């Protein structure tokens, strides 16, 4: 009886410990990252830029000339991305997080600020949307999260902080773009056009790999 009581007590303690351990498996910061990723990733898309080349007999040969990222901002299928992601495309193919593919139509562009708007006609239930932050209190040291498709590796999350504000960089057309947010979150080719999120999951910037 003595042995069985202690054995029972051991199992009770072990069970309780496992439950507590399960609750605290992730730090508060990790839980926040996981939550933001799960709420935001369905709004992030891959954009393939298809250019058409011609062979000796002038037969069209479609070929992917590049790819990048975009994100949906409403249930009408409006996507924000970088202009250089879609520049020169004969055809745009948008891949949602559920792997479904949809033709994209360029409906707006601001080359001077490297911004573009793409539209898709996909069922509204097949994606989520992101909201822009209304806060002007963006500060150096603030935590940020970047979502995108670096090197074609879809649905990638990286984290970091705001390293500096008000930077100036040159766009591909040579024009200077001001008011840039610098971050140490890893942003590589393919991330361009993806969202930079604050700790509430709101968009505070659009990623550009330089």
Label for each model-derived stretch:
Residues 3, 16-18, 179:
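Intrinsic low-complexity/disordered segments
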Residues 21-210:
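Serine-dependent protease modules
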């Amino acid at each position: 009886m003595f042995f069985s009581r202690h054995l029972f007590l051991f199992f009770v303690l072990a069970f309780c410990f496992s439950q507590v351990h399960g609750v605290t498996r992730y730090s508060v910061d990790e839980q926040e990252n996981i939550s933001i990723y799960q709420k935001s990733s369905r709004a992030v898309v891959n954009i393939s830029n298809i250019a058409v080349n011609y062979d000796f007999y002038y037969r069209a040969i479609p070929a992917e000339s590049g790819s990048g990222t975009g994100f949906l901002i409403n249930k009408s299928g409006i996507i924000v991305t970088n202009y250089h992601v879609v520049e020169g495309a004969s055809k745009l193919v948008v891949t949602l997080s559920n792997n479904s593919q949809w033709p994209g139509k360029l409906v707006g562009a601001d080359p001077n600020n490297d911004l573009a708007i793409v539209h898709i006609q996909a069922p509204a239930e097949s994606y989520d949307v992101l909201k822009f932050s209304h806060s002007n209190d963006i500060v150096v040291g603030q935590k940020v999260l970047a979502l995108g498709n670096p090197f074609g590796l879809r649905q990638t999350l990286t984290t970091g902080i705001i390293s500096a504000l008000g930077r100036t960089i040159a766009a591909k057309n040579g024009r200077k773009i001001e008011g840039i947010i610098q971050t140490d979150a890893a942003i590589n080719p393919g991330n361009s056009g993806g969202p930079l999120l604050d700790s509430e999951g709101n968009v505070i910037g659009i990623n550009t790999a330089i």
